[in-house]
Amino acid sequence: NKASERKHALCMVSGEIDVFVKKHPQSIIPKNGKAKLISCNDPNGFVWRGRFTDKWQASTVGYIASQKAHNALRWLISEQGIQERVGTESHAKKVFLCWNPAGKTLPRPMRRMRNADAEPLQKPSDYKEQLKSTLLSFRKDHQLQDTDCAILASFDAATTGRLAVTYYNEITLKTFLERMQDWDAHCCWHMGANGIEAPDLLQIVDCAFGRQVKEHKRVKKGKKDWEEKEINKLETDEQIQRRYLQNLLNCKVNGGIFPRDILKALTQRASSPQAFDEANWRKIVHAACAALQKYRYDTKQGGNEMAWELDTKNRSFQYGRLLATMEWAEEAYYKRKYAGEKEEEARQTNAIRYIYDFRQRPFSTTERINCLLKHAYLDRIDKWQANRYNQLVGEILSILREFPENELNQPLEDLYLMGYELQRNAFFTKKDTTNHTEEE
């Protein structure tokens, strides 16, 4: 009869005659419902079956092949693979895996390579040397060879019943490590107190597309006491998160160009500080600068902007420096007036408040901010700070005068963010903070 005919069939995986499987294992990924990789349970209510009259004509998988594949995958996910989950803990809809067939430990492709014991670095050359050293130590510690293999895969569950392989790649370990190092060497920026480092892929996605939400977090107060603290964090919709994490992973592993749509989202948000609190906006600016540097490197426009001299002849870059200088002068006034008070941290400067207008009409907006500074702030800060401000503004304007007059008020390119960040970082270096002793 029909049932006995189908008991044995050609396994389309192994190419051998075997007992075919009607129902394949489910729940391959823990906490992911009953999602199946292979499912053919549609005797009625199906959408489209093409030319097939029954489900067995589409494919047949033998019992041995099915058990080997599903058990190996289940073991990889639980034991050997480097997992990066996307979604809530109770239902992780997407799982990224990275493993070596010989069981050797590999670096996490979704994370930056870091040396936990290293001091924060401020010089790009020191950062790249540390990156090379970290990679060499990792290879030595885990006995990695150039001929070893790295396998990357991602699994996505659109529903609780269906699981799909959305990405699969096999590359040599030499290529894999080179691309990990190349990404971290160029998609990086000054991250405040952490020094120069590359943002994680999830951090980039959250900065580009996350909405700001409030979260209650327990923080330690003293040796034994804890307190509830309300903080703002960036949280991205799961569907958006899954899509763009996949794009970034493809770019990082395959050595592709940094996605232009993600870069555009980052730079637009970096020009909208009013939508975020101070801490989250700074994270977005840092991520935008890292992404911009990587994109310029990928498209052969640059890629080593952190090593730029402050007198670089670029209009947008110099306007960014000017923005940071005006912000610094006003912050100096707030620090003096509200020293140690919450008002010092909460007050937003005019330079940041007008940043959108500044990007569209830099020259006229500069005049407006500078006028506010002269009338309300410069006379109330330390003399050496006022002298430093006037000196820097004079230097920057002398460079800008070298450009045609009709270009001075044209909209700025994204490079103004880099000029702003590099000048702001220069204000907080030891060299700059000690300059006042000489100027006094």
How would you describe each model-predicted region?
Residues 1, 18-440:
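Extended alpha-helical scaffolding segments
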Residues 3-9:
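Short metal-coordination and nucleic-acid-contact micro-motifs, chiefly zinc-binding Cys/His arrays
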Residues 8, 17-18:
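Protease-labile, long low-complexity intrinsically disordered regions enriched in Pro/Ser/Thr
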Residues 14:
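Short Cys/His-rich metal-coordination motifs, predominantly Zn2+-binding knuckles/fingers
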